[in-house]
């Protein structure tokens, strides 16, 4: 029998310890992985609610199971808030992840073997934008565009490539691009070749919601995003569109029943909370600070002699090219991690290293900004990171790591994730 008093600590102490250790890790480490963030206690409360128990196949008002009247309220709340947040006529809040949202868009608009044109993973795209190891590169004929040696999208080259390969869909969006994307230009190119423009805005959705990064909504046929990352919600996906009922029906059918069964109603409840939080005025302040912090960090890295891909950032992330310092991304990632600074290794343009080694690191500011870091704090942090990188392969490396870790623990104590 079930009792409210049941808990993990008594029943499964090994699992409980892992949870406690992760809580401590998050509090005592500075999180600079661009795709990570901290969900609010309200989001986590919703995700742990009793909607965990409810099957709700179908959509609000059209369910295959009974007892869905409250699930309908929750899902409709999430839909309405998502539409208001991004200026969309249509929203599907059921995708379990960003990748599943993307898969649904492909299924709705393409046939197997159709040509897609997306940004290369090695140049800052995403697995689902046509990488050979992804469904997007296996089911569809994937062509890839890249960035210049300066780290920028060459729209003239993209136009030429689109006219040559004649894609059914052009995919916009990225996982490691630090500049503004010209969505209008991409739509112009798509229209020239009769292609759909599909934008995956997962990395910058929070910035877009706050108005600090241009929205693709006026230009794209369909837009997807994750609900974590800069949106700081639960892990999940979202599809948005401004079009017509025929398009919306195709998208709905591609999510359910084609791609998924029952939605995760407890996660949809958490998405509803996330969207409400993102509609608050303080969310705009937070997102503006995310960009300010990224720019402040870039300034320090450049002053210390490190190359930043595209020479700067206009969003929440940037790539540090370590080639001229003779370092690999893998080694830099490991060294910073020992000082409780978490980044991820990342390929840079024309990277001479293998994908699991790389010549760069990706740095993002959503999580550190969420816990209260300002420009002064992140500038100091960037200096500590440069100290560690400068000391690699030198006699004082271990001491620099030890000294930096002390500073990291002190600032984490001053600015806790969950005070």
From Swiss-Prot:
Family that this chain belongs to: Belongs to the SHMT family.
Gene3D superfamilies, sorted: Aspartate Aminotransferase, domain 1 (3.90.1150.10), Type I PLP-dependent aspartate aminotransferase-like (Major domain) (3.40.640.10)
InterPro entries, per the entry: PyrdxlP-dep_Trfase, PyrdxlP-dep_Trfase_major, PyrdxlP-dep_Trfase_small, Ser_HO-MeTrfase, Ser_HO-MeTrfase-like, Ser_HO-MeTrfase_PLP_BS, SHMT-like_dom
Pathway(s) where this gene product acts: One-carbon metabolism; tetrahydrofolate interconversion; Amino-acid biosynthesis; glycine biosynthesis; glycine from L-serine: step 1/1
Reactions mediated catalytically: (6R)-5,10-methylene-5,6,7,8-tetrahydrofolate + glycine + H2O = (6S)-5,6,7,8-tetrahydrofolate + L-serine
Record text on subunit structure and interactions: Homodimer.
Keywords: Amino-acid biosynthesis, Cytoplasm, One-carbon metabolism, Pyridoxal phosphate, Transferase
Site (Plays an important role in substrate specificity): 228
List of residues that carry N6-(pyridoxal phosphate)lysine: 229
Transmembrane segments: none
Cofactor: pyridoxal 5'-phosphate
Biological role: Catalyzes the reversible interconversion of serine and glycine with tetrahydrofolate (THF) serving as the one-carbon carrier. This reaction serves as the major source of one-carbon groups required for the biosynthesis of purines, thymidylate, methionine, and other important biomolecules. Also exhibits THF-independent aldolase activity toward beta-hydroxyamino acids, producing glycine and aldehydes, via a retro-aldol mechanism.
One cellular-component annotation, GO: cytosol
Entry superkingdom: Bacteria
MF (Gene Ontology): glycine hydroxymethyltransferase activity; pyridoxal phosphate binding
GO biological process, one term: tetrahydrofolate interconversion
EC number: 2.1.2.1
Entry's localization field: Cytoplasm
Species annotation: Histophilus somni (strain 2336) (Haemophilus somnus)
Enzyme category, top tier: transferase
Amino-acid positions noted as binding (6S)-5,6,7,8-tetrahydrofolate in the UniProt annotation, renumbered to this chain: 121, 125-127
UniProt protein name: Serine hydroxymethyltransferase
């Amino acid at each position: 029998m079930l009792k409210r008093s049941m808990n993990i600590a008594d029943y499964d102490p090994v699992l409980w310890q892992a949870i406690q250790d992760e809580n401590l890790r998050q509090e005592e480490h500075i999180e600079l992985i661009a795709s990570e963030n901290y969900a609010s206690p309200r989001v986590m409360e919703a995700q742990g609610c009793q909607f965990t128990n409810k099957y709700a196949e179908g959509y609000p008002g059209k369910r295959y199971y009974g007892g869905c009247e409250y699930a309908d309220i929750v899902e409709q709340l999430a839909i309405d808030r998502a539409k208001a947040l991004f200026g969309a006529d249509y929203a599907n809040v059921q995708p379990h992840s960003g990748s599943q949202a993307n898969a649904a868009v492909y299924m709705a608009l393409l046939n197997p073997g159709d040509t897609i044109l997306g940004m290369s993973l090695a140049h800052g795209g995403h697995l689902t934008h046509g990488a050979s190891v992804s469904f997007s590169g296996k089911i569809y004929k994937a062509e890839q565009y890249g960035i210049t040696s300066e780290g920028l999208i060459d729209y003239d080259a993209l136009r030429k490539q689109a006219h040559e390969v004649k894609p059914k869909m052009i995919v916009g969006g990225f996982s490691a691009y630090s500049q503004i994307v010209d969505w209008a230009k991409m739509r112009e190119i798509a229209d020239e070749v009769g292609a759909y423009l599909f934008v995956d805005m997962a990395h910058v959705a929070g910035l877009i919601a706050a108005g600090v990064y241009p929205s693709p909504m006026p230009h794209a046929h369909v837009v997807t995003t994750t609900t974590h990352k800069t949106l700081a919600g639960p892990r999940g996906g979202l599809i948005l569109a401004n079009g017509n009922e025929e398009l919306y029906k195709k998208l709905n059918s591609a999510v359910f029943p084609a791609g998924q069964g029952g939605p995760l109603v407890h996660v949809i409840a958490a998405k509803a909370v996330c969207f409400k939080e993102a509609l608050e005025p303080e969310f705009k302040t937070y997102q503006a600070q995310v960009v300010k912090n990224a720019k402040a960090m870039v300034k320090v890295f450049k002053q210390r002699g490190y190359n930043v891909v595209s020479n700067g950032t206009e969003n929440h992330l940037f790539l540090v090219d370590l080639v001229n310092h003779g370092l690999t991304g893998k080694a830099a990632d490991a060294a910073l991690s020992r000082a409780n600074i978490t980044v991820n290794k990342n390929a840079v343009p024309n990277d001479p290293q293998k994908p699991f080694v790389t010549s760069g690191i990706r740095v993002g500011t959503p999580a550190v900004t969420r816990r209260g870091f300002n420009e002064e704090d992140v500038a100091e942090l960037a200096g500590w990171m440069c100290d560690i990188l400068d000391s690699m392969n030198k006699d004082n490396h271990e001491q620099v790591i030890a000294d930096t870790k002390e500073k990291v623990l002190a600032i984490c104590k001053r600015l806790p994730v969950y005070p």
